[in-house]
Each structure stands twice: as structure tokens, then as C-alpha cells.
């Protein structure tokens, strides 16, 4: 089966240009201008209204298998990603069992090999049981089979533990992807410690619970040279800490989520569907993140 798509808008690394695309057996065979339609089985004129771009990569997804398949599976999550144009996703380790040993990682990898619709690259946990404390995993044994290490959902509380993790990951050329949350600063909170929280008598999570750990970890990344990625930042202080660290040459990157760019704590309206971690922050936090997207 050959398909010729004419007049599609193609991304060339610096912008879009109009071209024709010839597909054979569902794969691109050639890309150019004025490709002949002789011998093709199907012809479609995109009229400049469709776009051809490289596959997207999502560095933070939750496929939840093994252990939580009632929430998501590798088949459903990777299938949804494929439908949206993603060709690679990096799977977080909030699983049961956590991928903290080669044997536990092999359980996850077996499901990936069987069910994944696209490339799925797993993270291993930083600590045993993904607890953010206690004993570090065997980085050296896990490293060849993972994209990096993360305790996503838990912040690594002890500075010495995180320093050792970064030093070992630096030696292995692996990234640490960190959920940043200082437990002692959470105050039993469950939404942002802002005006809405106070007006409605809720217990709030301080912004410092996030940015203080980012500040610590940026210093450790500077000391060790480890590549450091910050998960789902939500505060304006986090944005500035990371911006200053990058200016100083620290190998740090970060991400946020679409909900932190379009919603804030004013949108809560006592609706539990808006509860998440990190929580929706203030309008000024949202605007700060919005201004820094892609910078």
C-alpha cells in the first residue's frame, strides 16, 4: 500500500515548508517537492492544512503498570501517546513493585516489550521502595536499562543521600529527575497555602516546600556535575531558582504541566477534581511559569 500526501506543511528544524510525502507500508519512503503520483494506491491533497513534524517526546508519564492497572496501563497510555503524535515517552517509577532492583525492573520491561505501542523508556527509583529516604538503589546494576532515576511522588529528604545519588549518576552519565518536596514544610496541607486556602479554612502547602529542595539540589548538581531535571514545577520561586542556576552553568532542566499554565488556586471552587500534587498555585505563580515556557 502506497500513499502520496501532497502539499503538507513539513518541519525542517527552522520552520515549516510545503512538500509531498510518499508512504509505503505505513512508513515514509521519500519526502520532497512534486513527487510523482504514478503507481500510488492512494492520493491525498493536504492543501497546506496538515502538518508533518518529528515525533514528540514526553519525559514524564505515568503508565502505572505493574501495580495500578486500574488507573492506566502501558498499552492504554502508550496508545494514547501514539494517537497524539508521541513516539517516545519516559515512564515514572511509581509502581508496585517499584523498579528498584533489576528483577523488579524486568517485570515492568516485560510488559513494555509485550504491550507498548511506541518507545517507552523506564525510570528506576532513586531509593529502595521509592520512599525518598533510607537506602539507595544499585545504580550501577540498573543504569544500562533505564533512561534515568527518579523517586517521583517523593522528594529525597536527606541531602547526603541525594549528593551520593548525584555523584553515582554523574559517573554513569544518567539524569536525576526529581520530585521536589520538603516534607517538613508541607504542614499537613493539601492545597496551596494562599488566599483561597486561608479564606476557606483549609490547610496549605507552602511554596517553600518545593523551591527549597530545588535550591538544595541545584547546589548539589553544581558540586557533582550531575544532570538534574526538576519535575512539574509550580511556583514562581522555583522558576527563578532554576533560571539563576542555569545562568551559573548548572546542568539543570525543568518541566511543568499544562494545568499549572492555565489554572490557579482561584479556580478550586471546593472541587476535589482540582486536587493534585504539587497543588495549583497562585495567579502570580501561573503567570511566572507562562512567561518562562521555552526559555
What do the predicted segments below correspond to?
Residues 1-39, 50:
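N-terminal metal-binding scaffold of metallo-dependent hydrolase/deaminase domains
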Residues 70-78, 130-140, 216:
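Short, acidic/polar
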Residues 59-72, 121-134, 153, 202-208:
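Active-site mouth loops of central-metabolism enzymes
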Residues 8, 26, 49, 60, ...:
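Divalent metal-coordination and catalytic microenvironments
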Residues 50-115:
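Metal-associated gating/positioning segment near the N- to mid-region
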Residues 102-119, 168-178:
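Alpha-helix-loop-beta-strand connector modules within alpha/beta enzyme cores
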Residues 134-292:
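Histidine/acidic residue-rich metal-binding segments in metalloenzymes
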Amino acid at each position: 500500500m502506497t500513499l502520496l500526501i501532497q502539499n503538507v506543511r513539513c518541519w525542517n528544524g527552522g520552520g515549516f515548508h510545503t512538500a509531498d510525502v510518499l508512504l509505503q507500508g505505513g512508513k515514509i519512503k521519500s519526502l520532497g517537492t512534486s513527487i510523482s503520483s504514478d503507481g500510488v494506491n492512494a492520493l491525498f491533497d493536504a492543501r497546506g492544512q496538515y502538518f508533518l513534524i518529528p515525533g514528540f517526546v514526553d519525559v514524564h508519564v505515568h503508565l502505572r503498570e505493574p501495580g495500578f492497572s486500574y488507573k492506566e496501563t502501558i498499552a492504554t497510555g502508550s496508545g494514547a501517546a501514539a494517537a497524539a503524535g508521541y513516539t517516545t515517552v519516559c515512564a515514572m517509577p511509581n509502581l508496585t513493585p517499584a523498579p528498584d532492583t533489576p528483577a523488579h525492573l524486568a517485570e515492568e520491561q516485560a510488559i513494555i516489550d509485550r504491550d507498548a505501542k511506541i518507545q517507552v523508556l523506564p525510570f528506576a527509583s532513586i531509593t529502595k521502595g521509592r520512599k525518598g529516604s533510607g537506602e539507595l538503589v544499585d545504580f550501577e546494576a540498573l543504569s544500562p536499562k533505564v533512561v534515568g532515576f527518579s523517586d517521583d511522588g517523593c522528594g529525597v529528604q536527606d541531602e547526603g543521600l541525594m549528593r551520593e545519588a548525584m555523584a553515582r549518576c554523574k559517573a554513569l552519565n544518567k539524569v536525576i529527575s526529581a520530585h521536589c518536596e520538603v516534607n517538613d514544610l508541607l504542614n499537613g496541607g493539601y492545597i496551596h497555602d494562599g488566599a483561597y486556602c486561608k479564606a476557606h479554612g483549609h490547610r496549605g502547602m507552602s511554596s517553600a516546600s518545593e523551591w527549597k529542595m530545588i535550591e538544595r539540589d541545584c547546589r548539589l548538581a553544581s558540586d557533582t556535575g550531575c544532570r538534574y531535571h526538576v519535575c512539574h514545577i509550580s511556583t514562581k520561586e522555583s522558576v527563578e531558582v532554576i533560571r539563576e542556576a542555569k545562568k551559573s552553568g548548572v546542568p539543570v532542566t525543568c518541566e511543568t504541566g499544562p494545568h499549572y499554565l492555565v489554572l490557579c488556586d482561584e479556580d478550586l471552587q471546593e472541587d476535589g477534581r482540582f486536587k493534585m500534587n504539587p497543588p495549583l498555585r497562585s495567579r502570580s505563580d501561573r503567570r511566572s511559569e507562562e512567561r518562562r515556557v521555552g526559555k
